[in-house]
Amino acid sequence: MSTKYIFVTGGVVSSIGKGIVAASLGRLLKNRGLKVTIQKFDPYINIDPGTMSPYQHGEVFVTDDGAETDLDLGHYERFIDINLNKYSNVTTGKIYSEVLRKERKGEYLGATVQVIPHITDALKDKIKRAARTTDSDVIITEVGGTVGDIESLPFLEALRQMKADVGADNVMYIHTTLLPYLKAAGEMKTKPTQHSVKELRGLGIQPNMLVIRTEKPAGQNIKNKLAQFCDVAPEAVIESLDVEHLYQIPLDLQAQKMDQIVCDHLKLDVPAADMTEWSAMVEKVMSLEKQVRIALVGKYVELPDAYISVVEALKHAGYANDAEVKIDWIDANQVTVENAAELLGSADGIIVPGGFGQRGTEGKIQTIRYAREQDVPMLGVCLGMQLTCVEFARHVLGLADANSAELNPDTPFPIIDLMRDQIDVEDLGGTLRLGLYPSKLKSGSKAAAAYDHQEVVQRRHRHRYEFNNAFREQFEAAGFVFSGVSPDNRLVEIVEIPENKFFVACQYHPELSSRPNRPEGLYTAFVTAAVEKSSDR
């Protein structure tokens, strides 16, 4: 069977939910027995989002092979339950840097290097390579931004050319747009969608399907109007209504036969999608009996997208405990030794997620101290683990000036220090310890119990600093347990205090491996402890 290519574009406004639509379609096609992969084209000039502020871009999602990517890849992985690779996120910066590098090496044999064909060929190669490296039947490619953006033009041209390259039967274009409701007029307006499709047609792409994002059901008359003006079949005008839970969306799209229309267009003769297990999960999510309150103490709490995988992993762990997770967003800058009890006292559990830089770290340290002293279940992640070690050094070991060398290079007690292979690194982008690495678990520890007593777990990392092993014996003598280490015993991966209900921190990012139907072990153990604390109140 020829590989099938589905391209998802957006119009009218950004942040319209293209990624969720693409991921939901991917889930439906996977449940039809197809092997699916998915990728995101981001038209910004950055090489990747690794050096971008979370306020600009949200979280950085890390793949198994160490690519720093768009947060939409997290949605893709959670919905479709696949592990993506570096070909799943492509930026303008990445493409141009590769083309320019080839030009400097003389690989274009003296040709004038241009957007067409060199940039578009490079983009098409990324699409085909993503499909080829995963041996996929179907690849879904989402283009970030909206039709009409200057930055998107080479990407859309590459998508247009794909139809001629691989054949019309192997390509489908899906366009997502906003269908606004004007309260004063009491009606929905189709003109923005019509103009968006007109713009797309002007670039040589005729959409085969429209997905309209709307707050209210559009009705068949609106669908017929859009079908007529945009030259798509009426049944191929699909509604994407606002929902209470994101995981309802694949079921809503299936009810409108979206996946069947796609299969018919691409001439895919495959069984209907069996969504029984997914439906049961959604039903459970919508009828959780318990509630648990988690304080998330972070640096970027004004923008929840900066912690989107953390939030989703907490929700998944809640599902496993029949509990709805309510998150209290606490600005780490506001936490002091004087007000910690006031800010954190109502929490059943506390999570200190990752981050970079000095701002907010003292507040996080006070948060960790409060959790340790008051025996509140706590999970520290990445920087959260590093600051857990700093807090213990200061307030248990009596090393008052202890710190991380990242935060204070002159500290006399560098509990956290630069990794040896990072000493001569000058560039910020793409130079961290990235991707999947193993952690050997200590038998009898809470970490081992969280992972069903496995000997080794593999999780994704994104860090430059590590625990300073010169202090390991001193910590262990005071009851601090290093419950996860690298197989060569050099790098600390997980720490815990066994006397507490649940006081565990890890260097890696467990949230990146969580799935709604398969929650991550440490997150599940943490939320379980928080639920137990809640029931004891």
Swiss-Prot record:
GO BP terms in the entry: 'de novo' CTP biosynthetic process; pyrimidine nucleobase biosynthetic process
Annotated L-glutamine binding sites: 55, 355, 383-386, 406, 464
Pfam families: CTP_synth_N, GATase
Regulation: Allosterically activated by GTP, when glutamine is the substrate; GTP has no effect on the reaction when ammonia is the substrate. The allosteric effector GTP functions by stabilizing the protein conformation that binds the tetrahedral intermediate(s) formed during glutamine hydrolysis. Inhibited by the product CTP, via allosteric rather than competitive inhibition.
InterPro entries membership: Class_I_gatase-like, CTP_synthase, CTP_synthase_N, GATASE, GATase1_CTP_Synthase, P-loop_NTPase
EC number of this enzyme: 6.3.4.2
Entries under CDD domains matching the protein: CTPS_N, GATase1_CTP_Synthase
Chain positions recorded as ATP binding sites: 15-20, 72
Pathway terms, separated by semicolons: Pyrimidine metabolism; CTP biosynthesis via de novo pathway; CTP from UDP: step 2/2
Region (Amidoligase domain): 1-268
Binding-site residues, CTP: 14, 149-151, 189-194, 225
Catalytic activity: UTP + L-glutamine + ATP + H2O = CTP + L-glutamate + ADP + phosphate + 2 H(+); L-glutamine + H2O = L-glutamate + NH4(+); UTP + NH4(+) + ATP = CTP + ADP + phosphate + 2 H(+)
Glutamine amidotransferase type-1 domain location: 293-536
Binding-site residues for Mg(2+), renumbered to this chain: 72, 142
Gene Ontology molecular-function annotations: ATP binding; CTP synthase activity; glutaminase activity; identical protein binding; metal ion binding
Binding site for UTP: 14, 189-194, 225
Keywords from the named record: ATP-binding, Glutamine amidotransferase, Ligase, Magnesium, Metal-binding, Nucleotide-binding, Pyrimidine biosynthesis
Miscellaneous section: CTPSs have evolved a hybrid strategy for distinguishing between UTP and CTP. The overlapping regions of the product feedback inhibitory and substrate sites recognize a common feature in both compounds, the triphosphate moiety. To differentiate isosteric substrate and product pyrimidine rings, an additional pocket far from the expected kinase/ligase catalytic site, specifically recognizes the cytosine and ribose portions of the product inhibitor.
Stored NCBIfam families: PRK05380.1, PyrG
Known partners and oligomeric status: Homotetramer.
HAMAP family referenced in this protein's UniProt entry, alphabetically: PyrG
Family from the record: Belongs to the CTP synthase family.
Protein name, as recorded: CTP synthase
Organism, as annotated: Streptococcus sanguinis (strain SK36)
Lineage of the organism: Bacteria, Bacillati, Bacillota, Bacilli, Lactobacillales
Gene designation: pyrG
